[in-house]
Amino acid sequence: MQIHLNIDDLPAYPYPTNFLHFASIEPETDIEPWWLLVYNAGTINNWYKTLKQLYPERTLIPFAKFNANDDIACFDGDDFSGQPHVLIIHAYASEGWELHATYASFDKWLEEAMVQNAEWLNED
């Protein structure tokens, strides 16, 4: 499966290996209410630019969006370790109020996303 990770301002961002593996799995793993931004060219870049305009003091690498609100899961773009924290940013919130949650890694975020997926599916 082709994934699109290009960000004009950060052409060599070191995405976590586990994220790259997860995003490349075919068929795509259902994590609804979250969905990955990597499957359409330009989506990550567009969200990166939007978040940079909203929160210029932050460097946020968006990778997933929550269906029910404006929450965006982002890697900490100032962390080039290959294992950045995941920040849940409520897009369009007033600056200083945008951070909803933090996870130590992509794997920790994915664990929570899978819990949310099970809850989402049980609501039907």
Identify what each model region corresponds to:
Residues 31, 38, 86-89, 115:
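Extended aliphatic helical segments
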